[in-house]
């Protein structure tokens, strides 16, 4: 009886921890190790199991976008147009020259044509039979000066025509005497025949009578206006021969372009 009790007591005693062995799996590895070495199975639905790809940086994306935006601009950018005019024809060959487009707007041609109907300007052009103050090149310079001054076309009046014509004579003519008669046509409208006055005679006449002194004050005012007109053009009074030809080519059949000194007999 005592031996039986002793065996029962020994069977209920706890075994040492070292003698316990972990539970083995069917493969012979501990369960804990098997769990650690497991490969993850398929992920949840809707989740990409592949590792995420490395996306391009924002700077690189922006460069790509800039390059793609520049391509249509390069394709759509218009090339500068050139104007070619046929100059001579020789058999089947044609010689052409390039001509730049005139910057004079049509409204300034209209202002010029309107002022040609002024009675005082008509008398000046009719009087100048020798074309000493109003040949075709000087009149073309008037249109160029209208364009450079930049006033609206409806603001140009008789005084502006005389200012531009006088300034054109200053630039192109060496003889000072003929252009002095422009003053008399502007301020003395009743005269139909005015002799060409030299500078000395002009200086003498202004001291002889009160009327001449009045004209002297008007001439001084005219020269003041001429200076203001010259400044409004930003002091650009020189006009090239090419530009003068372009102005005449706008309306080549205009009657003022027949005022050529080369055609005088």
Swiss-Prot record:
Disulphide-bridged cysteine pairs: none
GO MF term list: acetylcholine receptor regulator activity; protein kinase binding
InterPro entries: Speedy
Domain of life (superkingdom): Eukaryota
Biased composition (Acidic residues): 66-80
Region described as Disordered: 1-80
A Pfam family assignment: Spy1
Summary of the function given for this chain in its UniProt record: Acts as a modulator of the nicotinic acetylcholine receptor alpha-7 (CHRNA7) activity.
Family note: Belongs to the Speedy/Ringo family.
Name the record gives this protein: Speedy protein E11
Higher taxonomy: Eukaryota, Metazoa, Chordata, Craniata, Vertebrata
């Amino acid at each position: 009886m005592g031996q039986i009790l002793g065996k029962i007591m020994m069977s209920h005693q706890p075994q040492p921890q070292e003698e316990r062995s972990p539970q083995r799996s069917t493969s012979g590895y501990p369960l804990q190790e098997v769990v650690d070495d497991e490969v993850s199975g398929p992920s949840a639905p809707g989740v990409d199991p592949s590792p995420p790809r490395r996306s391009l940086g924002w700077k690189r994306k922006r460069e790509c976008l800039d390059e793609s935006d520049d391509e249509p601009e390069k394709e759509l950018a218009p090339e500068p147009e050139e104007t070619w005019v046929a100059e001579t024809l020789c058999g089947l060959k044609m010689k052409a020259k390039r001509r730049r487009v005139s910057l004079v707007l049509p409204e300034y041609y209209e202002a010029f044509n309107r002022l040609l109907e002024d009675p005082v300007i008509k008398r000046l052009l009719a009087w100048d039979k020798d074309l000493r103050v109003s040949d075709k090149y000087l009149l073309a310079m008037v249109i160029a000066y209208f364009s450079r001054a930049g006033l609206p076309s409806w603001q140009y009046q008789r005084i502006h025509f005389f200012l531009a014509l006088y300034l054109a004579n200053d630039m192109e003519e060496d003889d000072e005497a003929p252009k002095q008669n422009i003053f008399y046509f502007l301020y003395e409208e009743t005269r139909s025949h005015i002799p060409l006055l030299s500078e000395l005679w002009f200086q003498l006449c202004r001291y002889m009578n009160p009327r001449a002194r009045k004209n002297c004050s008007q001439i001084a005012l005219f020269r003041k206006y001429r200076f203001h007109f010259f400044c409004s053009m930003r002091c650009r009074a020189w006009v090239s021969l090419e530009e003068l030809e372009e102005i005449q080519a706008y309306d080549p059949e205009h009657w003022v372009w027949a005022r050529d000194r080369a055609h005088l007999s």
